[in-house]
From Swiss-Prot:
GO biological process, one term: maturation of SSU-rRNA
GO cellular component: cytosol
Protein's name in the database: Ribosome-binding factor A
Gene: rbfA
GO MF annotation: an example: ribosomal small subunit binding
Subunit: Monomer. Binds 30S ribosomal subunits, but not 50S ribosomal subunits or 70S ribosomes.
Native species: Desulfitobacterium hafniense (strain Y51)
PROSITE patterns per UniProt: RBFA
Function summary: One of several proteins that assist in the late maturation steps of the functional core of the 30S ribosomal subunit. Associates with free 30S ribosomal subunits (but not with 30S subunits that are part of 70S ribosomes or polysomes). Required for efficient processing of 16S rRNA. May interact with the 5'-terminal helix region of 16S rRNA.
InterPro entries referenced in this protein's UniProt entry, alphabetically: KH_dom-like_a/b, RbfA, RbfA_dom_sf, Ribosome-bd_factorA_CS
């Protein structure tokens, strides 16, 4: 039961925090940020918000720093928007899964090209 509730809250937080970042946060350091997932502790006291940032590593670092500084504001807004007795503590984390997936895709393309090259050479002989 508690897991179901935390999953439901995680999805709600993802939507609300995405909207807050898009519409309310005016920090110029925040670039094109996407909330990829939210993990809420079973006691609903903490929420890890995973974000990805479009741009280079410096833009990602700047955006994450700005989000961390705005965590208190985000928490207070969540408390107003979502009916909870206590709003969870918000912690922003950089999500590297998209970069990791792109790296794996690049490696797979390289393997495929090598295989095609090897097949082409074996047919020539």
């Amino acid at each position: 039961m508690a897991k179901h509730r935390s999953n439901r809250l995680a999805e709600t937080l993802k939507q609300e925090i995405s909207q807050l970042i898009r519409e309310e946060l005016k920090d110029p350091r925040i670039g094109f940020v996407t909330v990829t997932s939210v993990e809420v502790a079973d006691d609903l006291g903490n929420a890890k918000v995973y974000v990805s940032v479009l741009g280079d590593s410096q833009q990602a670092k700047d955006s994450l720093d700005a989000l961390k500084r705005a965590a208190g504001f985000v928490r207070s807004e969540i408390g107003k928007r979502v009916r909870l007795r206590h709003a969870p503590e918000i912690v922003f984390k950089y999500d590297t899964s998209i970069e990791h997936g792109a790296h794996i895709a690049q490696l797979l393309r390289g393997v495929k090209q090598e295989e095609e090259k090897d097949e082409g050479e074996s047919h020539d002989q």
